[in-house]
Amino acid sequence: EAAIGTDYYELLDRVEPNLVFVAGPDHLHAEQALSALDRGCHVLIEKPLATTVEDAHRLVEAQQRTGLQVMADHTARYLYPYHEMVLAARAGEIGQVFFTQGDYLHDMWAHYSPQGDRHTPWRIDSDNPQNILLGGGCHALDTMLWAINSPVEEVYGYSNKMSAPDFPADDCYILVLRFTNGVLGKIFVASGCS
């Protein structure tokens, strides 16, 4: 029988789990994961691991201090077409990969608008708005890293706030990447597509 509660920290203390899956609002991921690590739990974190570089460093330090496992859950890896594409690229079945492109284009108004059928207020909180690059564009980047199997050595990007004008943060991104093996990549992310 599953334990339930309305206070995350009280629930951790009461249940004393071995593993915690963090899948709440993006801006809470790091704090909830750190609390679980401090209580001796391994942690699986729905992407993104953190929304700031400082929080990402805190997670790495806590993992090293505790020796517990911390893992990002990139859900696109569970999708059969992605898996097959990556296997084919890595096996050379599609020839030598010299360029890769990944897009993450969504009409997020169902999530952003109070009238939306999937409205999630935390995504448009002006103090902690969801970063669509971290919250969605990471699928394209993770799939590229998985398929190309080479670190990124250089990246540049641009963003604007034009595709979803009422959203409180940038909503359109383009990144250009160079991998250490010479492969080039491009990622396009937008949250106001309809």
Predicted regions located by residue number:
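Short loop/edge segments at beta-strand edges and connector loops
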Residues: 6, 45, 72, 156-159, ...
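NAD(P)-dinucleotide binding in Rossmann-like oxidoreductases
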Residues: 165-170, 180-194
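Predominantly a Rossmann-like dinucleotide-binding segment in NAD(P)-dependent oxidoreductases
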Residues: 76-167
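Rossmann-like NAD(P)(H) cofactor-binding subdomain of soluble oxidoreductases
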Residues: 28, 48, 71-78
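Rossmann-fold dehydrogenase core element
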Residues: 58-76, 96-99
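Beta-loop-alpha module in the N-terminal Rossmann-like domain of NAD(P)-dependent dehydrogenases
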Residues: 2-62
